[in-house]
């Protein structure tokens, strides 16, 4: 969204709905975990090329006569699969992008995977900071749990870069008396 968001005539207040990401962009990734009764658990990343999803890393395999399950599917741009665990990509910092879990299932013909985020909800806050476009800023934060983590962070500085509309974001859970 732009600032002010969605054509509002004034700055938004706490509690104003923010729909967040509403469409896929080239380069977006989905992280899937698939379990096959015969072949076990496999992990893969799929990347959006503008019209379809392509396997970027990992593998998903199962026997023709079984229906695999997908215990987890994530849209978490800062993360990657590493030996069956989600870990931060090099140079990425927890809490500076989304971490949303969706649902997935194999299509009836076994030729595709249907991924849904329609029932997904953020279990964290998204704090938008309005500044100048494409500007680096430093934000100090205290008593905060970044999205995708269970570790509470004490006083820490975050280096953020605003987008072309002047928005920078933090994603996480803010405790009572958190400071930004």
Feature locations, PLM:
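Sec-type signal peptide cleavage vicinity
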Residues: 1-180
């Amino acid at each position: 969204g732009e600032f002010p968001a969605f054509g509002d005539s004034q700055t938004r207040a706490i509690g104003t709905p923010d729909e967040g990401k509403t469409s896929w962009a080239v380069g977006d990734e989905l992280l899937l975990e698939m379990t096959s009764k015969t072949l076990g658990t496999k992990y893969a990343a799929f990347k959006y090329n503008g019209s379809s999803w392509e396997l970027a890393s990992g593998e998903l395999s199962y026997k023709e006569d079984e229906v695999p399950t997908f215990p987890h599917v994530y849209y978490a741009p800062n993360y990657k699969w590493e030996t069956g665990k989600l870990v931060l990509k090099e140079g990425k910092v927890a809490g500076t992008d989304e971490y949303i879990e969706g649902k997935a299932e194999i299509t009836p013909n076994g030729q595709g995977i249907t991924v849904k985020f329609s029932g997904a909800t953020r279990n964290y806050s998204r704090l938008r900071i309005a500044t100048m476009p494409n500007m680096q800023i430093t934000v100090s934060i205290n008593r905060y749990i970044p999205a995708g983590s269970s570790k509470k962070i004490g006083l820490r500085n975050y280096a953020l870069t605003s987008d072309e509309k002047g928005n920078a974001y933090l994603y996480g859970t803010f405790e009572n008396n958190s400071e930004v």
